[in-house]
Amino acid sequence: MSSNFDKFQKRRLISSYFSVVLSVFLVLFLLGVLGLFIINSKKLADDFKEKIAMTVFFKNEANDSIIKAFNSELKRAPFALSYVYVTKEKAAKEHTDIIGEDFLTFLGENPLLNSYDIHLKADYVERDSILKIESALRKNTMIEDIVYDKQLVNLVNDNIKKVSMWILIISGFLTVIAVLLINSSLRLSIHSNRFIIKTMQMVGATKSFIRKPFVMRSVKLGMLGALLAIIALIGLLFYVETNFPGLGILEDKALIGLVLLAVFGLGVLITWVSTHFATQRFLNLRTDDLY
């Protein structure tokens, strides 16, 4: 009879441990996926921003020395990611290729201007930053005009802000759910040991002494769940990289490592905090309340 009871207790204990590891694994895996999505969504947003070009047109009076001086200025400019000089002849050829007709034959002259196509760094593709850059460039009296898609810049930045806000809301919601799920699993695990906790307290053991083995065990289970989540996340990363190489999901290894480290840290932190408060709850209960 005693043997059967011991087997039952052992099975219940294993089941309790398994539920803790599983809940930690699932929750941290979801949070890890969200973290990886956040760092890659910023990368995708930056890539899109850096594709928006600003075109600087020069007056016909601008000679080669002025063009070269402007080129040197761009080399030193902190906002310039890349730039290409487009001569009026090259621009005319491109227009001819697009419309399929040589417009120079009936115009008699080339009305186009020499220009620079400038791609800005993502941090500078903001409404205020671009206006400052435009204002600074217009001080050059040889510049005829500066053209870029203002509506697209505003639209991109507004949408990025909206997406970022929703990501933060979802992250906060998932974090709360994570803590509640893991906390619930740990409380159920400790609940089965409530009489042991109270017995140890009655024979004079200090609260910290009673808490220690439960906290250590839960932290180990949290570490196991976190490691399983990290393995699953690494597998997911390689799967995405293999099937969608164009995304370049493995390029920023430092940030990926930071996300994986955060997943492991959360596994330890959440289980430690949850177990601490769960054991404290049973330590504060009266003996009659244990039943």
From Swiss-Prot:
Gene Ontology biological process terms from the UniProt entry: cell division; cell gliding; response to virus
Ranges facing Cytoplasmic side: 1-18, 184-220, 275-291
Membrane-protein topology: Multi-pass membrane protein
Keywords carried by this UniProt record: Cell cycle, Cell division, Cell inner membrane, Cell membrane, Membrane, Transmembrane, Transmembrane helix
Membrane-crossing residue ranges in chain numbering: 19-39, 163-183, 221-241, 254-274
Gene Ontology cellular-component annotations: Gram-negative-bacterium-type cell wall; plasma membrane
Family: Belongs to the ABC-4 integral membrane protein family. FtsX subfamily.
Superkingdom of origin organism: Bacteria
Source organism per UniProt: Flavobacterium johnsoniae (strain ATCC 17061 / DSM 2064 / JCM 8514 / BCRC 14874 / CCUG 350202 / NBRC 14942 / NCIMB 11054 / UW101) (Cytophaga johnsonae)
Matching InterPro entries: ABC3_permease_C, FtsX, FtsX_ECD
Role according to the record: Required for cell division and gliding motility.
Subcellular compartments: Cell inner membrane
Knocked-out gene: effects: Filamentous cell morphology and multiple septa. Filaments cross walls but cells fail to separate. Gliding motility defects. Resistant to infection by a number of F.johnsoniae bacteriophages.
Name of the protein in question: Cell division protein FtsX
Residues in compartment: Periplasmic: 40-162, 242-253
